[in-house]
């Protein structure tokens, strides 16, 4: 019914709730049971909904929300009245969401495929080729790398750095085809996507190779190791964690 990746389906009193991933941001679609007419839950920011809590005899449900510059929040939504209520906001000492920004861009990989990437930093910061850049990647096993708040990223941004997270092929962000395009004989696509992310950031004056550190864990550790070996002049430092380096 929908071209976007379906994450979850829930039932409430008068509606079915479809949770989709639309260009690496959550989308809640409400299907009215009697007519199957659909409506969208309105939300101003791009981020991720999770932990949906529903009851079949109520039109009210709860969910958590986060993105790269928004610590976890819990909301109540009334599907019948189309009203949203804030229940709880996580307090992170020293962090003020309005002082930071996160935006999504699309950049071309080596074969021309457009790859989404989130770039986050302080709003009032002057960004140029001397800005420290932390580039994180995974790209495998049908795992979607979704926008979420991280104290590690906050610390990096607070010290004046840029955080960039591309959604590489091999993940589940766009469904099974996206996954298959980054596995087995197509694994090189993932390394190319990661290198192209660095090239885009350098070309657009977010940083330079000597100021760029790449990070990844497990499959992301393999990604970091392989990409650095193939394109060593793109990076100043690497942080591979528990990567399978003999593949």
Predicted regions and their residues:
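Hydrophobic beta-strand positions in blades of beta-propellers and related beta-sheet-rich domains
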Residues: 28-30, 72-76, 84
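Beta-strand C-termini and the immediately following turn/loop, strongest in propeller blades
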Residues: 10, 17-24, 32, 62-69, ...
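Conserved hydrolase catalytic core segment
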Residues: 226-237, 243
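Cap/lid segment of the alpha/beta-hydrolase catalytic domain
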Residues: 44, 77-83, 88-213, 217-218, ...
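Conserved beta-propeller blade repeats
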Residues: 2-19, 46-64, 103-104, 150-154
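Long, ordered, helix-rich scaffold segments
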Residues: 18-19, 34, 39-40, 53, ...
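Multi-bladed beta-propeller domains
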Residues: 1-6, 10, 33-51, 80-99
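C-terminal low-complexity, glycine/proline- and small-hydrophobic-enriched intrinsically disordered tails
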Residues: 6-10, 14-17, 28-33, 38, ...
